[in-house]
Amino acid sequence: MIEDNKENKDHSLERGRATLIFSLKNEVGGLIKALKIFQEKHVNLLHIESRKSKRRNSEFEIFVDCDTNREQLNDIFHLLKSHTNVLSVTPPDNFTMKEEGMESVPWFPKKISDLDHCANRVLMYGSELDADHPGFKDNVYRKRRKYFADLAMSYKYGDPIPKVEFTEEEIKTWGTVFRELNKLYPTHACREYLKNLPLLSKYCGYREDNIPQLEDISNFLKERTGFSIRPVAGYLSPRDFLSGLAFRVFHCTQYVRHSSDPFYTPEPDTCHELLGHVPLLAEPSFAQFSQEIGLASLGASEEAVQKLATCYFFTVEFGLCKQDGQLRVFGAGLLSSISELKHVLSGHAKVKPFDPKITYKQECLITTFQDVYFVSESFEDAKEKMREFTKTIKRPFGVKYNPYTRSIQILKDAKSITNAMNELRHDLDVVSDALGKVSRQLSV
């Protein structure tokens, strides 16, 4: 009993980075009172930002990033509730789950609406830009970035994605990138990409003089592969980003790179997302490959998540495949970068066969060309290799996605596994019956 109490106490003192969003009336002293709660609980504030509430004109929303333990976070939540409207509390990744037999498992979303708890844990927010960013000294650009960040931070599951009126400068930047990349796609992009790009032009307004709206793209993808788009303010951690893929949700930025250098961006922007990722998210086999990496990440250790993220990086972002005896590109980072797209098929780039056991050890480079690129025989080949690799990830349970409820089934005991098998048995019966009918028709 003494050991159990000690274990519970240690559990409550686990530390991590948490985020809270709460609203305050626009009155003198309101913020000071709220921040005093953090001070009294000895919680270190890492970042704080305010924005005008979109719910009530008389209120402001406060975004707080802090270093805390479970006990402190619980106390702060209850104290804040007494005189603020707490809109969102996102616990750290390392705060473990409370379900029986899963005490050592990091928290992960169980239903699609749970993504509301992790989609705002961006590593950089709004107008925060590094000193070497092309838009660092451009106050107009920084203000615009904050506008896009606020849209994303206000988004909740089930909301329509707000339509954006892009500026003339943003459309011109997009148009420059769109025009130059489309010159390369016929000789560089894989056939699946080339098949889907015209459909996006037809149904989503992909044009040189128009930046497509995320809501239109999301609706298109839902019909094609069941994927949907969720706006995000910036970089997410690998765990948070991959968890979205498990639900066939792609976290997508909406801001445009700085106009001073349309062929370079140090971070994912709408040109990268819409031209690099979206055409292949409309491809069923590729969509399944992406989702399976996401499912493998749920509840996995930090080490395992990092391995999965590296494999994702060298496939979905910078992957190559073989088609008709030639190398073709399917990685979004390549398909949205004119210079690197030319480089990777120039004959000067180092290329190796994709093998997750080797690939996960490779360093990911962000601001330069990759030292090596990995080639798969096909999406199916990459998928099979990743399936074998994910079997090596230690997890005290299995997971299965339920597309009807858009939730995760945790397979951890005889009952849950039996239920999953019954569902599969029904699906197999349907396929078997169809095969029988086809066979009888052929024999007539």
From Swiss-Prot:
Subunit organization: Homotetramer. Interacts with DNAJC12.
Taxonomic lineage: Eukaryota, Metazoa, Chordata, Craniata, Vertebrata
A GO biological-process term: aromatic amino acid metabolic process
Binding site for L-tryptophan: Y235, R257, T265, S336, I366
EC number: 1.14.16.4
Name of the protein: Tryptophan 5-hydroxylase 1
InterPro entries in alphabetical order: ACT-like_dom_sf (IPR045865), ACT_dom (IPR002912), ArAA_hydroxylase (IPR001273), ArAA_hydroxylase_Fe/CU_BS (IPR018301), ArAA_hydroxylase_sf (IPR036951), Aro-AA_hydroxylase_C_sf (IPR036329), Aromatic-AA_hydroxylase_C (IPR019774), Trp_5_mOase (IPR005963)
A GO term, aspect molecular function: tryptophan 5-monooxygenase activity
PANTHER family with a match to the protein in the record: AROMATIC AMINO ACID HYDROXYLASE, TRYPTOPHAN 5-HYDROXYLASE 1
Stated family: Belongs to the biopterin-dependent aromatic amino acid hydroxylase family.
Record key words, sorted: Iron, Metal-binding, Monooxygenase, Oxidoreductase, Phosphoprotein, Serotonin biosynthesis, Ubl conjugation
ACT domain residues: 19-94
One of the Pfam families matching this protein, by short name: Biopterin_H
Binding locations of Fe cation: H272, H277, E317
Catalytic activity: (6R)-L-erythro-5,6,7,8-tetrahydrobiopterin + L-tryptophan + O2 = 5-hydroxy-L-tryptophan + (4aS,6R)-4a-hydroxy-L-erythro-5,6,7,8-tetrahydrobiopterin
Name of the encoding gene: TPH1
Pathways involved: Aromatic compound metabolism; serotonin biosynthesis; serotonin from L-tryptophan: step 1/2
Phosphoserine modified-residue sites: S58
